[in-house]
Amino acid sequence: MDVFKKGFSIAKEGVVGAVEKTKQGVTEAAEKTKEGVMYVGAKTKENVVQSVTSVAEKTKEQANAVSEAVVSSVNTVATKTVEEAENIAVTSGVVRKEDLRPSAPQQEGEASKEKEEVAEEAQSGGD
């Protein structure tokens, strides 16, 4: 009987040892799995943040480019509108060309062209 007890005791120790080893192995595997998942999650988060930041920066650059183009276009339209309004006022005789102050520095070609137009208007009587 002692032989059986001793045999079963040894077997029990073996099973307990195996269970402990299995439990330890499962725990280690779970820890490694957790580490792996956390690593992948952290890297994914970094990449997502980097991608979002990159997209936001590109969007900001594009918005700046568009706003610069819009401002430039608005300035051009405003300048042309003022020029045309001045031309209409001069042509209709409401104001004289000399009474208008220059809205922007003119280039040489534009200044001589306007002088010719004023001279022609004076000859034709403003019609």
Curated annotation (Swiss-Prot):
Keyword Cytoplasm: yes
Quaternary structure and interacting proteins, as annotated: May be a centrosome-associated protein. Interacts with MYOC; affects its secretion and its aggregation.
Gene: SNCG
Species of the source: Homo sapiens (Human)
Family: Belongs to the synuclein family.
GO molecular function, one term: cuprous ion binding
Keywords: Cytoplasm, Cytoskeleton, Phosphoprotein, Repeat
GO terms for cellular component: axon terminus; centrosome; cytoplasm; cytosol; extracellular exosome; Golgi apparatus; neuronal cell body; perinuclear region of cytoplasm
Function per UniProt: Plays a role in neurofilament network integrity. May be involved in modulating axonal architecture during development and in the adult. In vitro, increases the susceptibility of neurofilament-H to calcium-dependent proteases. May also function in modulating the keratin network in skin. Activates the MAPK and Elk-1 signal transduction pathway.
Lineage: Eukaryota, Metazoa, Chordata, Craniata, Vertebrata
Protein name listed in UniProt: Gamma-synuclein
Post-translational modification: Phosphorylated. Phosphorylation by GRK5 appears to occur on residues distinct from the residue phosphorylated by other kinases.
Sequence repeat locations: 20-30, 31-41, 42-56, 57-67
Region (4 X 11 AA tandem repeats of [EGSA]-K-T-K-[EQ]-[GQ]-V-X(4)): 20-67
Biological-process GO terms, alphabetical: adult locomotory behavior; chemical synaptic transmission; protein secretion; regulation of dopamine secretion; regulation of neurotransmitter secretion; synapse organization; synaptic vesicle endocytosis
Pfam families to which the protein is assigned, alphabetical: Synuclein (PF01387)
Membrane-spanning segments: none
Presence of keyword Protease: no
Tissues of expression: Highly expressed in brain, particularly in the substantia nigra. Also expressed in the corpus callosum, heart, skeletal muscle, ovary, testis, colon and spleen. Weak expression in pancreas, kidney and lung.
Localization of this protein: Cytoplasm, Perinuclear region; Cytoplasm, Cytoskeleton, Microtubule organizing center, Centrosome; Cytoplasm, Cytoskeleton, Spindle
Principal localisation: cytoplasm
Modified residues (Phosphoserine): 67, 72, 124
Region span, Disordered: 96-127
